[in-house]
Amino acid sequence: MIKFALALTLCLAGASLSLAQHNPQWWGNRNTIVHLFEWKWADIAEECEDFLAPRGFAGVQVSPVNENIISPGRPWWERYQPISYKLTTRSGNEEEFADMVRRCNDVGIRIYVDVLLNHMSGDFDGVAVGTAGTEAEPSKKSFPGVPYSAQDFHPSCEITDWNDRYQVQNCELVGLKDLNQHSDYVRSKLIEFLDHLIELGVAGFRVDAAKHMASEDLEYIYDNLSNLNIEHGFPHNARAFIFQEVIDHGHETVSREEYNGLGAVTEFRFSEEIGRAFRGNNALKWLQSWGTGWGFLDSDQALTFVDNHDNQRDQGSVLNYKSPKQYKMATAFHLAYPYGISRVMSSFAFDDHDTPPPQDAQENIISPEFGEDGGCLNGWICEHRWRQIYAMVGFKNAVRDTELSEWWDNGDNQIAFCRGNKGFLAINNNLYDLSQELNTCLPAGEYCDVISGSLIDGACTGKSVRVNERGYGYIHIGADEFDGVLALHVDAKV
């Protein structure tokens, strides 16, 4: 009986930890993460204070913080090839990182670190040098900066059969040296690395290549992490938010369901299907059942996105900044529909898969510059600074915890819906105008369309809609309009 009680206690404790790892630890009603891909720590600190906090963003996903290999031309993916766990990269050093985390936390912006637990750097001829000056010999699996040696890795093999679980979780992903997470020593080094980041005040982690690690090994690592640092405003006994990269298109040998009990999972099907819909390959009317009705994970388990730093570079259905009208429509739907833990992308311009972030002649990452409209210049795209996107972050905050209601569609690619009595969204992806009297569910009054303009000193710089006593308003979105979206909410009442 005592053994049973102990087993039950341990089981409940484990379940409690796993549930806690689904909590992003947001402030107030904020509920959108932005991925500031390849930004420098000092620039992120300023962005938290000057832009993200005033506009209601909840958190920032940052690029990997650990020392990485220096690759010719400095492609973005060198950040995903660790040399050591020293916190020195082209984004800055440990002091700059710690300063950024503190400053962002002080204004209610949480920091989530992209972490590499699966592997170290891939093959390199001779001695490789990292961004902190540490030497390593990847071909010999020698990483003195940790230190790791050959005994800490799985035997070398290629993934040639993606239906073979052993290969997927033990062989080398694109030649990257595959760590043995079942080893007590490797586990201890990974926990030490993550705990150091927790001590510095981060709120959680995006776990790269999670499907290439056994879920039971990850569970051990997560369960043995420290609680979040209360000196950064986290409650006592709060756990790190975990979201895991698991690419699962369905019928995979390693499935997302093996990981969703440990934390959230990146819902790649969301990205693919929303791209198909707004590219015109699936009628928007079908989005009424969006979410689990499409075979997606439960809402609180799904990290959702239109595109990410990987798939935005691939050919296919996924939308990116190069299709701005469709991208903004898809993002508006993403942030308005009550499904998932939302993340928006902030990119730099790229011409090919390997394009590095904007850099100077000495290969130092350069800071973004801003135009008069607040948008980014000098090679940075900064989708999060597009009015149509940051306005929808405000919309999502305004309608938090409300239900979707009053769905309307024209049987094709014009849709509209309410979020309780706090928000209304309409989208026109047809080649003809949307002109319709629709129920906005809002209290009577005049509302600023936050897509076409902003509410400044009580006046709307874009379109506005007058809502009558029954909650109805005349909605017009021309086929040739710049954005194809109209959004109203209670915090944008004129």
From Swiss-Prot:
The record marks 310 as: Transition state stabilizer. The modification Pyrrolidone carboxylic acid is found at residue 21. Disulfide bonds join 48-104, 157-171, 376-382, 418-441, 448-460. Its main location: secreted. Residues 1-20 form the signal peptide. The active site is at 208 (nucleophile), 245 (proton donor). InterPro entries: A-amylase/branching_C, A-amylase_C, Alpha_amylase, Glyco_hydro_13_cat_dom, Glyco_hydro_b, Glycoside_hydrolase_SF. Its EC number is 3.2.1.1. It is an enzyme of class 3 (hydrolase). One of its GO terms (cellular component) is extracellular region. It catalyses: Endohydrolysis of (1->4)-alpha-D-glucosidic linkages in polysaccharides containing three or more (1->4)-alpha-linked D-glucose units. Its cofactor is Ca(2+); chloride. Binds 1 Ca(2+) ion per subunit. Binds 1 Cl(-) ion per subunit. Coiled coil: none annotated. GO terms for molecular function: alpha-amylase activity; metal ion binding. The keyword Signal applies. Ca(2+) binds at residues 118, 169, 178, 212. One of its GO terms (biological process) is carbohydrate metabolic process. Chloride binds at residues 206, 308, 343. It holds the Pfam family Alpha-amylase_C. It is found in: Secreted. It comes from the Eukaryota. Keywords: Calcium, Carbohydrate metabolism, Chloride, Disulfide bond, Glycosidase, Hydrolase, Metal-binding, Pyrrolidone carboxylic acid, Secreted, Signal. Belongs to the glycosyl hydrolase 13 family. Monomer. This is Alpha-amylase-related protein. It comes from Drosophila auraria (Fruit fly).
